[in-house]
Amino acid sequence: MTDETASQEASQSTDAAAPARGFRKVREGLVVSDKMTKTVVVAVEDRVQHPLYGKTIRRTKKVKAHDESGTTGVGDRVLLMETRPLSATKRWRIVQVLEKAK
């Protein structure tokens, strides 16, 4: 019995010692530029409510995203995920292409 409890305690201590990873942000956006190698510029839209008037406002932010395969083009709707810094301004990567441009 003592061997079982010792192994259970050891497994629990290693789980507790490992730092918990944070939740990665996922966004959907539209590719607006693909002129860089392995990098695309994606316009990400965010809808926020005005603090005083309550009207819903669309805010757009352009982010640079890593495109390893280079298959995305201008006008494609893509799914982005936050990642470690890949360059001075690139902190997102493309997870999948949701819709190709027509």
Curated annotation (Swiss-Prot):
GO cellular component: cytosolic small ribosomal subunit
A GO biological-process term: translation
Residue segments, region Disordered: 1-20
PROSITE patterns: RIBOSOMAL_S17 (PS00056)
Compositionally biased intervals (Polar residues): 1-15
GO MF term (any one): structural constituent of ribosome
Keywords: Ribonucleoprotein, Ribosomal protein, RNA-binding, rRNA-binding
Gene3D superfamilies (alphabetical): Nucleic acid-binding proteins
Superkingdom, natural source: Bacteria
Family: Belongs to the universal ribosomal protein uS17 family.
Record's function text: One of the primary rRNA binding proteins, it binds specifically to the 5'-end of 16S ribosomal RNA.
Subunit-level organization: Part of the 30S ribosomal subunit.
NCBIfam families membership: PRK05610.1, uS17_bact
Protein name listed in UniProt: Small ribosomal subunit protein uS17
Protein source organism: Frankia casuarinae (strain DSM 45818 / CECT 9043 / HFP020203 / CcI3)
Chain's gene name: rpsQ
